[in-house]
């Protein structure tokens, strides 16, 4: 008998510009941003299973119990106090995306850039906008605003409502660390966040969260182009189509300008 929470797997090929040379890379994703936004907070994929598909990524945990950071094959939970903690591989995730990170290009990061300016610089790299990208940004940050949220209990509210009323924001100054980010094309906006989505982990592995705003110091960005996406879909859960407005409300809610 199939388990109650049976999950289907779909392999999605992301469009590739004709004649664009690139090493094939596949990302793995648990569920979709549409499901998460609608309150699909109970997953059946373990952290250990997720790590079979990649060593670099981001997401959350069952009940939206903090922000997930995957770096160098280690998984951390950023809790509402802004602290980061290693996670047991038996824990479950309702939403995550990972890749076996193998950067193909690098870019120097100069000091004084806002999050939007950093994203624009990454977007200017000579790749196809129809593809997915992963970016690892190492360096010092003059300031960085990070957030997390407390674990939810059923009946679950939509994520926009949770973030609006329960997110906790912390501002760090002069901190060394790593941004873990993915960029999805607009055509995949119901699958994952269209545009850039970053989580942060400090160099001492003690602080972290979802990035709302920042001002860069000097650093370096490593970028990987991704041609394919494998998704594990839930067999049941809330149905929803993610609007650009709802995604923006979740991604940058409460962010303050650092310029």
Spans of model-derived segments:
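Bacterial N-terminal signal peptides that target proteins for export
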Residues: 1-9
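Bacterial N-terminal signal peptides
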Residues: 8-17
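Boundary at the C-terminal end of the N-terminal hydrophobic targeting segment
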Residues: 22-24
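N-terminal low-complexity or amphipathic/hydrophobic leaders
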Residues: 35-96
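A glycine-rich, hydrophobic loop/mini-helix early in the fold
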Residues: 78-125
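Long, positively charged binding patches that form subdomain-scale interaction surfaces
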Residues: 119-181, 189-191
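Histidine-centered divalent-metal-coordination microenvironment in nucleic-acid enzymes
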Residues: 193-201
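A hydrophobic, small-residue-rich beta->alpha segment in the mid-to-C-terminal subdomain
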Residues: 202-245
């Amino acid at each position: 008998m199939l388990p109650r929470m049976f999950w289907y797997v779909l392999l999605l090929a992301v469009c590739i510009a004709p004649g664009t040379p690139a090493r094939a890379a596949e990302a793995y994703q648990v569920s979709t941003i549409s499901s998460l936004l609608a309150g699909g907070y109970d997953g059946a994929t373990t952290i250990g299973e997720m790590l079979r598909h990649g060593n670099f990524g981001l997401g959350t945990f069952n009940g939206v119990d903090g922000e997930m950071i995957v770096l160098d094959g280690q998984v951390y939970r950023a809790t509402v106090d802004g602290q980061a903690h290693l996670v047991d591989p038996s824990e479950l995730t309702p939403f995550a995306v990972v890749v076996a990170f193998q950067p193909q290009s690098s870019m120097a990061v100069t000091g004084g850039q806002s999050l939007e300016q950093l994203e624009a610089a990454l977007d200017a790299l000579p790749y196809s906008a129809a593809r997915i990208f992963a970016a690892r940004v190492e360096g010092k940050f003059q300031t960085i605003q990070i957030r997390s949220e407390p674990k939810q209990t059923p009946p679950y509210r939509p994520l926009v409502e949770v973030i609006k009323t329960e997110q906790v924001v912390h501002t760090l100054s002069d901190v060394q660390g790593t941004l873990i980010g993915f960029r999805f094309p607009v055509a995949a906006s119901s699958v994952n966040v269209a545009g850039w989505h970053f989580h942060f982990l400090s160099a001492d592995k003690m602080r972290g969260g979802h990035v709302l705003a920042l001002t860069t110091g000097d650093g370096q960005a490593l970028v990987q182009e991704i041609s394919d996406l494998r998704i594990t879909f839930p067999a049941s859960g809330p149905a929803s189509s993610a609007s650009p407005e709802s995604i923006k409300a979740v991604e940058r809610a409460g962010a303050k300008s650092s310029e």
